[in-house]
Regions:
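Membrane-interface junctions at transmembrane-helix termini in multi-pass inner-membrane proteins
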Residues: 1, 165-192
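Interhelical loop/hinge segments that connect adjacent transmembrane helices in multipass membrane
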Residues: 1-3, 16-59, 102, 106-114, ...
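Hydrophobic alpha-helical transmembrane segments
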Residues: 1-24, 194-199, 213-237
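Interfacial transmembrane-helix starts/ends
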Residues: 42, 79, 111-128, 135-140, ...
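Alpha-helical transmembrane segments of polytopic membrane transporters and translocases
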Residues: 47, 62-64, 76-92, 125, ...
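Helix-loop interface residues and adjacent transmembrane-helix termini in multi-pass membrane transporters
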Residues: 69-72, 182-184, 210
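Interfacial segments at transmembrane-helix termini and the short loops linking adjacent helices
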Residues: 72-74, 139-168, 214
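Helix-loop junctions and terminal segments of transmembrane helices
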Residues: 81, 85-110, 179-182
Length: 252
């Protein structure tokens, strides 16, 4: 509880500091505001808030199972092996951020072919990054992690490989989450988050109890794969629906 309160306090202080630091860079005035509009905005953003929470939960569900069935040493090993997954997400973020505005403009202007092309290129870039890191992890991952953390992780190379595959699925799911948000179908994401979280909650303890760290890695990877596939199906469904609706509009 102390850590949570400290985190909240630091966040509030940082917010105040940044507002004071940047207040002269922006000039705007608010003459009036509508509580109804604010309420609608909060309702529209609710799936994004819940999704951010559940994304974190998907990564932590195997850790909860490890905490219940394995030793603290195994928990530490899993944390060490999980570190390279953040590299995939970091690099994919560099690919994703520059094209967000472009994707939004293309979708709003009904340029569906160009929109689909950019989506494909983003998935291709994420897949390429994931494959490069997976290859590097297979060759150097465990030796480097063993050197960094001062423990012998060489016997867990298969666990690292599975986790890196899961990291790739996670990055693809994040891309699809952004695409669905741009398409204004963020509520559809709740199905993906719900099913993936249910899988992680139910099967993480079973897999960890029977397979140890490999079970935790499989639970993480399968949960992210489920999330990615559901999001991808929704994207294809809504894209096809949008294209059909445009084709049905009579030309003037």
């Amino acid at each position: 509880m102390t850590a949570i309160l400290a985190s909240i306090l630091v966040s509030v202080l940082m917010l105040i500091f940044l507002l004071l630091l940047t207040k002269d860079a922006f000039s705007f005035s608010v003459r009036s505001f509508s509580m109804a509009s604010i309420g609608r905005l909060l309702v529209e953003c609710f799936p994004l808030c819940l999704g951010a929470f559940l994304l974190i939960y998907l990564g932590n569900a195997p850790k909860y199972a490890i905490d219940s069935y394995l030793s603290s040493t195994m928990q530490a090993y899993y944390t060490y092996l999980f570190m390279p997954c953040f590299v995939i997400n970091l690099l994919v973020g560099f690919v994703l951020q520059p094209v967000l505005v472009k994707l939004t403009v293309l979708w709003e202007q009904k340029k569906n072919q160009a929109f689909l092309k950019y989506c494909f290129l983003m998935h291709l870039a994420a897949l390429g990054i994931s494959l490069v890191i997976l290859l590097g992890g297979a060759i150097l991952g465990c030796p480097v992690l063993s050197l960094v953390f001062g423990v012998n992780l060489n016997s867990y190379s298969a666990v690292l490989d599975v986790l890196l595959i899961g990291g790739g699925f996670f990055a693809l799911a994040v891309i699809d989450q952004v695409i669905l948000t741009i398409m204004r179908h963020q509520y559809a994401m709740l199905w993906g988050f719900g099913l993936a979280s249910l899988f992680a909650t139910v099967l993480s303890p079973v897999l960890v109890k029977s397979m140890g760290l490999m079970g935790a890695a499989l639970a993480y990877t399968c949960s992210d794969a489920i999330l990615f596939l559901i999001f991808l199906l929704f994207i294809l469904f809504y894209y096809r629906k949008e294209r059909c609706s445009l084709q049905s509009v009579p030309k003037m």
